[in-house]
Amino acid sequence: MFVNKKYTAKGKNLPSSPKKVRPIADNIRGKPYNEAVAILCSMPNKGAKLLGKVVKSAASNAMYHNRNLSEDMIFVKTVMVDDGRKRRSIWPRARGRADRLINRSCHIFVEVYEKMYGGE
């Protein structure tokens, strides 16, 4: 019998634009945990570092709840990157004008599952 259990982790209001993190998330979706972490560690992006922390947290949650689980049995199932809070501020310009500055953040949701063969 094929057994699947899901474990999740969330990162809220992480200081990076969702537009920059989503392409990185597409690279690791559906991959084994060890391969996903290797991909994220080799990327120079700030978003890869943030995403790596959330993926490691989800794997830690899985290994905490199931002591017999090893890293080889964990696969990344779902990675969602959503908009977080936007911090708006004013940027003074020439001739008394002002531009609006928007600092974006993102929420990252990662779901990993264990893949193992169990009894009936």
UniProtKB/Swiss-Prot annotation:
CDD domains: Ribosomal_L22 (cd00336). Keywords: Ribonucleoprotein, Ribosomal protein, RNA-binding, rRNA-binding. Transmembrane segments: none annotated. GO terms for cellular component: cytosolic large ribosomal subunit. GO terms for molecular function: rRNA binding; structural constituent of ribosome. Residues 1-25 are annotated as: Disordered. The keyword GTP-binding does not apply. This protein binds specifically to 23S rRNA; its binding is stimulated by other ribosomal proteins, e.g. L4, L17, and L20. It is important during the early stages of 50S assembly. It makes multiple contacts with different domains of the 23S rRNA in the assembled 50S subunit and ribosome. The globular domain of the protein is located near the polypeptide exit tunnel on the outside of the subunit, while an extended beta-hairpin is found that lines the wall of the exit tunnel in the center of the 70S ribosome. Part of the 50S ribosomal subunit. This is Large ribosomal subunit protein uL22.
